[in-house]
């Protein structure tokens, strides 16, 4: 919880990879939105080609998720690793998420829908760590300043 420096929007990981994002905190407790939540959307990339997309979960199996918005011109290979891309303050780049299991066309016809097997075993998950980004506030202030000057 907050007594230990945990705040909403902090990344949560385990030894296997990404678990989720801190959603709410109190003095001594935290609630996490796991990647196994239909409202979760994590920015990610393919390790081999470095094309980026979004990780989503669509109910069902606790070891399967999907990567969307990968362009059809991207080189995607089975068993390629999906990892965080570092585009936000929540997760640094390179934290493993899962392996490509199946590649198919998405309904929009311009991107892939990639089924992945998650590295994190949620059925046996016990210990997690929270990622602290000490430069997060500085980055947010700079982005706000840039937005204000743009207007």
What spans do the regions from the language model cover?
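A secondary-structure micro-motif
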Residues: 1-151
């Amino acid at each position: 919880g907050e007594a230990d420096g945990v705040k909403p929007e902090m990344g949560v990981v385990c030894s296997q990879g990404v678990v989720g994002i801190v959603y709410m905190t109190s003095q001594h407790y935290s609630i996490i939105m796991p990647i196994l939540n239909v409202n979760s959307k994590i920015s990610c990339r393919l390790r081999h080609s470095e094309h980026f997309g979004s990780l989503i979960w669509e109910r069902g199996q606790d070891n399967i998720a999907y990567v969307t918005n990968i362009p059809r011109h991207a080189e995607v290979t089975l068993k390629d690793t999906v990892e965080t891309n570092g585009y936000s303050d929540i997760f640094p780049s390179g934290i493993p998420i899962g392996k490509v299991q199946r590649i198919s066309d998405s309904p929009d016809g311009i991107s892939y829908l990639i089924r992945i097997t998650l590295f994190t075993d949620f059925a046996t998950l016990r210990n997690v760590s929270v990622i602290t980004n000490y430069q997060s506030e500085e980055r947010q202030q700079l982005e706000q300043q840039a937005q204000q000057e743009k207007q």
